């Protein structure tokens, strides 16, 4: 089997909080089940020029889109941001369209779901976003209203979508899709981060120290 790769698409105005839970766990592997291979998060940009996130962080992409080849075992994370309606994202959206057919896992949150919607990629797949009415208003090519589900995050085959205020649920759906956490580990990890109750930390530790 081809080695699984994880890509984080980076661009000006990307929303820092939306991918934090997810990439921290994927890159560290600290709660992975014993037979799960380690992963490295690779940042990919339209080009290799430095970008600035919404929070003011400067990120120099590891690779450009031209250097990024998405395989069926790979994951690409598409964060939200203020620019998804702009032409600069057309190259990644084209690549994502091909990758969806190939079986690559596509994880899109917040504004990135609008980019997918306007390309017609959500017209026949279960999905969610920040708001259906807003999606209908800003995405003229979107015809997937019957597949829209109200909820923080939705998974359908190789596609995960989420609201921008649900980064934790977004992470859970992607981690579940990749099958890198044992089910009880994922459940305890979610409860700890969702409730902030210390008993779930000890429950989490017990799931990985057996």
From Swiss-Prot:
Keyword vocabulary terms for this entry: Hydrolase, Protease
Active site: residue positions: 110 (nucleophile)
Alphabetical list of InterPro entries matching this protein: Class_I_gatase-like (IPR029062), DJ-1/PfpI (IPR002818), Prot/Nucl_acid_deglycase (IPR050325)
Enzymatic class: hydrolase
A Gene Ontology term for the protein's cellular component: cytoplasm
Database matches in CDD domains: GATase1_PfpI_3
Start and end residues of each PfpI endopeptidase domain: 4-180
Record GO biological process: proteolysis
GO molecular function: peptidase activity
Enzyme nomenclature, EC number: 3.2.-.-
Top-level taxonomic group: Bacteria
Family to which this protein belongs: Belongs to the peptidase C56 family.
Descriptive protein name: Uncharacterized protease YoaZ
Native source species: Bacillus subtilis (strain 168)
